[in-house]
């Protein structure tokens, strides 16, 4: 499939998701910027979040249930309230931002990876040579069990401690997204970007 047609189809899906408010509101401006480049199109994204997830065992997505999720900071009381609703094991998880971007060619992929690395996304790279998909990701993550079958496994002081760290790590990821946006805006302004 030709790049232009591929990008057009992916943009259609993105715009539909954006109109249905399925795209994290705090990352829309960055995604629009990425999509404004001729040689990039976003495939999926998450601006980072904190969640309480009920799981039978770690990694078991099929039976998982979100008991609470927040894309901005969260209060200890909100996490505790969500965890107490667990029927299995409630995990407090702080997810870092992640964006998948298809690029027209390897040169465009390298340019995007350089901008991502400059912004602090050190764990970014090409994850597929088909459409040169770049994963922009970082390592800010917390994942630990906090309750089981409605009973807290940790005391209030420890829960307060990890929620504070989760909020700080979430903010750090959001700051990186801001730096990525600045790097791409600078690239656009300098007219340094050209397709080969």
UniProtKB/Swiss-Prot annotation:
List, alphabetically, the PANTHER family matched.
TRNA WYBUTOSINE-SYNTHESIZING PROTEIN 3
Give any single GO term for biological process: tRNA methylation
Q: Which organism is it from?
A: Archaeoglobus fulgidus (strain ATCC 49558 / DSM 4304 / JCM 9628 / NBRC 100126 / VC-16)
One example of the protein's molecular function in GO is: tRNA methyltransferase activity
Protein task: S-adenosyl-L-methionine-dependent methyltransferase that acts as a component of the wyosine derivatives biosynthesis pathway.
Origin: domain of life: Archaea
Q: Which family does it belong to?
A: Belongs to the TYW3 family.
What SUPFAM superfamilies does this protein map onto? SSo0622-like
EC number of this enzyme: 2.1.1.282
- Which key words are in the record? Methyltransferase, S-adenosyl-L-methionine, Transferase, tRNA processing
Instruction: Using the record, list the residue span of the signal peptide; answer none if the entry has no such feature.
Output: none
Instruction: List the catalytic activities from the record.
Output: 4-demethyl-7-[(3S)-3-amino-3-carboxypropyl]wyosine(37) in tRNA(Phe) + S-adenosyl-L-methionine = 7-[(3S)-3-amino-3-carboxypropyl]wyosine(37) in tRNA(Phe) + S-adenosyl-L-homocysteine + H(+)
Q: Which HAMAP family match?
A: TYW3_archaea
| Name of this protein | tRNA(Phe) 7-((3-amino-3-carboxypropyl)-4-demethylwyosine(37)-N(4))-methyltransferase
């Amino acid at each position: 499939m030709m790049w232009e047609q591929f990008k057009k189809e992916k943009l259609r899906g993105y715009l539909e998701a954006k109109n249905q408010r399925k795209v994290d509101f705090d990352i829309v401006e960055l995604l629009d910027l990425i999509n404004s480049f001729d040689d990039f199109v976003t495939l999926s994204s998450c601006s980072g979040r904190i969640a309480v997830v009920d799981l039978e065992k770690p990694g078991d997505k099929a039976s998982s249930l979100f008991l609470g999720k927040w894309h901005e900071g969260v209060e200890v009381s909100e996490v505790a309230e969500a965890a107490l609703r667990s029927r299995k094991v409630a995990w407090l998880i702080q997810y870092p931002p992640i964006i998948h971007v298809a690029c027209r060619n390897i040169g465009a992929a390298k340019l995007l990876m350089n901008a991502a690395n400059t912004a602090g996304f050190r764990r970014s790279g090409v994850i597929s040579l088909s459409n040169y998909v770049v994963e922009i990701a970082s390592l800010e993550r917390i994942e630990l069990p906090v309750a089981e079958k409605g009973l807290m496994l940790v005391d209030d002081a420890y829960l307060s401690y990890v929620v504070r760290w989760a909020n700080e790590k979430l903010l750090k990821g959001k700051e990186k997204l801001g730096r990525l946006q600045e790097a791409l805006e600078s690239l656009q302004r300098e007219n340094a970007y050209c397709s080969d």
